[in-house]
């Protein structure tokens, strides 16, 4: 079966399982890597953080589906994980959800901003560092992620 078809079927079932478990699908990847084929499903918890238990329960359910449907003809590794502490920020919902958290934003013109997300209103992200506040239009963002705090 073609990779795109496998990915589509797995994503659909992953979204169903995630919804049942109060989770969301952050990403689904199926690709060949140096150690062989990898099916990577990244889950998210919209009201908190993903626990090891969340990954375990989700993994069991998706494994049942994969075994039953037998979509992948060759050997592969299944990985279920969270987006991580330094997770990418991928849209308005994330900027609202992570208000108060430390983030790094790189704009399309190459500028880098590191600061706390203060707000997201009408397409504008406001972040601040120790010195000042910055307002960044979401359309100008090339990439953004949370920064790990120690």
Curated annotation (Swiss-Prot):
Transmembrane domains' residue ranges: none
Localization: Cytoplasm
Keywords tagged on the record: Cytoplasm, Ribosome biogenesis
Record has Cytoplasm as a keyword: yes
A Gene Ontology biological process term: ribosomal small subunit assembly
Pfam families recorded: DUF150_C, RimP_N
GO cellular component, one term: cytosol
Record's function text: Required for maturation of 30S ribosomal subunits.
Assigned protein family: Belongs to the RimP family.
Protein name: Ribosome maturation factor RimP
Gene, per the UniProt record: rimP
């Amino acid at each position: 079966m073609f990779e795109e078809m496998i990915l589509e079927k797995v994503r659909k079932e992953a979204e169903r399982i995630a919804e049942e478990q109060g989770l969301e699908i952050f990403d689904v990847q199926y690709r060949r890597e140096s150690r062989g084929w990898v099916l990577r499903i990244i889950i998210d918890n919209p009201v908190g953080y993903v626990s090891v238990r969340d990954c375990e329960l989700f993994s069991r359910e998706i494994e049942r589906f994969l075994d039953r449907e037998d979509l992948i003809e060759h050997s592969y590794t299944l990985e279920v994980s969270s987006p991580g502490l330094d997770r990418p920020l991928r849209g308005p919902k994330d900027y609202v959800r992570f208000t108060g958290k430390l983030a790094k934003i790189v704009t399309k013109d190459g500028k880098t901003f590191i600061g706390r997300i203060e707000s997201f209103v009408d397409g504008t992200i406001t972040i601040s560092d120790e010195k000042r506040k910055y307002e960044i239009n979401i359309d100008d963002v090339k990439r953004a992620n949370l920064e790990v705090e120690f």
